[in-house]
Regions:
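Short amphipathic alpha-helical patches
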Residues: 67-72, 133-137, 190-194, 229-230, ...
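Terminal, charged accessory segments of proteins
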Residues: 1-183, 353
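Glycine- and acidic
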Residues: 25-26, 149, 184-189, 261-270
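Catalytic core segments in nucleotide and nucleic-acid processing enzymes
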Residues: 191-353
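Contiguous, non-catalytic segments that form substrate-binding/exosite surfaces or channel walls
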Residues: 165, 175-180, 185-186, 190, ...
């Protein structure tokens, strides 16, 4: 995979999470970053600083402790045991309003690893250290034990959502463990996590820049003429990454972020497109275009890799146009922006023809 410019990751994040285009985050657009660690450190610093001004969230947590005055519920079993001893304490279970919440633990742990990283500048480390004092009552946690799927967002903690997503990208996509069980940040983000960001970026880009194309993820029903319930239940769901719609036509974009976008042919020495990707996009197109009108197009949009043999191309498969395109995330942002705009404009022209 070609090396991504930190600034391009910022632009991708700013589309994926619109809050990064607002308030103090807007200044990031004019700032240069020599690596992604400094970029993340600054976004995290700004986000947490803003949250501190609003107030870090607190939650009620149940505690059980031996205390001298009754508080909450008396734990009879343990209290009776205590009476046989000194008898000056009683065991109670009570709720405590605390800063030591799961989300605050994630914020503190993320700052901790950014501060430990050799890639983060000392100036940014010092700024993060200044924020750590607000988390003195918050525990550090093992990044691998964070239950990300359990986080729930509501009106009071909605501002945490972007921060948690960014912390997930850092702690889940960059943390490396050594044989001694210690952790450190990797040089690059894990491809799987970058794939998810790449996909979300393209979807949100078209939603913002071309709202008339109604960019959305869509579930496609299998075009079955006769199938029993067992067959239907065993079929995988077909959900597109991005579907653009204009007039009576649709363009299905399958976003791909891989280390390699071509493979060696088993029949010759030449490079070929990955067959599984072509089969997938063709299945999406054919099942959406049930009437065989040719009004549904498909596109594989790869993040450009270092594969020199990769060529963009397009063809008509059984009446439907299928294209293979690349997006060079290591280049200038204006070129990325121009490429995405060209894809949208060409689709609109094709649909209007």
């Amino acid at each position: 995979m070609a090396v991504l410019k930190p600034k391009n990751i910022y632009y991708m994040l700013s589309y994926a999470y619109r809050v990064l285009t607002q308030g103090e985050f807007k200044n990031l657009d004019s700032e240069e970053f020599d690596n992604i660690h400094n970029l993340f450190a600054e976004i995290i610093r700004l986000g947490i600083s803003n949250q501190i001004k609003r107030g870090l969230i607190r939650e009620y947590e149940e505690h059980t402790d031996e205390i001298k005055t009754i508080r909450g519920k008396i734990c009879v079993k343990y209290s009776l045991r205590g009476l046989s001893g000194k008898g000056d304490t009683i065991t109670c279970s009570f709720d405590e309003y605390t800063l030591n919440t799961s989300m605050n633990q994630v914020l503190k742990t993320t700052m901790y690893y950014l501060i430990k990283s050799d890639e983060v500048s000392q100036t940014r480390k010092n700024k993060l250290k200044n924020l750590m004092k607000y988390f003195s009552d918050v525990e550090l946690i093992n990044p691998h034990l964070i239950k990300w799927s359990t986080f729930r967002y509501h009106r009071n903690n909605a501002a945490y959502k972007m921060l948690m997503n960014l912390c997930y990208l850092i702690l889940s996509g960059m943390i490396l463990s050594d044989t001694a069980g210690t952790h450190k940040l990797a040089e690059f983000i894990d491809d799987q996590k970058m794939h998810a960001l790449y996909e979300k970026f393209i979807l949100e880009y078209y939603r913002r820049e071309f709202p008339e194309l109604k960019a959305a993820k869509k579930e496609i029903a299998w075009d079955l003429s006769d199938a029993d319930e067992m067959m239907i239940s065993l079929l995988p769901k077909m959900i597109t990454d991005i579907t653009l719609t204009w007039e009576n036509k649709a363009l299905i974009i399958d976003a791909k972020y891989y280390g390699h976008s071509v493979a060696e042919s088993v029949h010759s020495d030449k490079k070929i497109y990955l067959s599984s990707n072509l089969y997938q996009i063709q299945a999406y197109v054919k099942n959406m275009d049930k009437e065989r009108t040719g009004n549904v197009e498909g596109m594989l949009l790869y993040a450009k890799t270092d594969d020199e043999a990769f060529n963009e191309s397009s063809g008509v498969f059984g009446g439907n146009k299928i294209s293979v395109r690349t997006l060079d995330l290591s280049g200038d942002w204006k070129d990325i922006d121009s490429k995405l705009k060209t894809i949208a404009k060409e689709f609109k022209e094709s649909a209007s023809a």
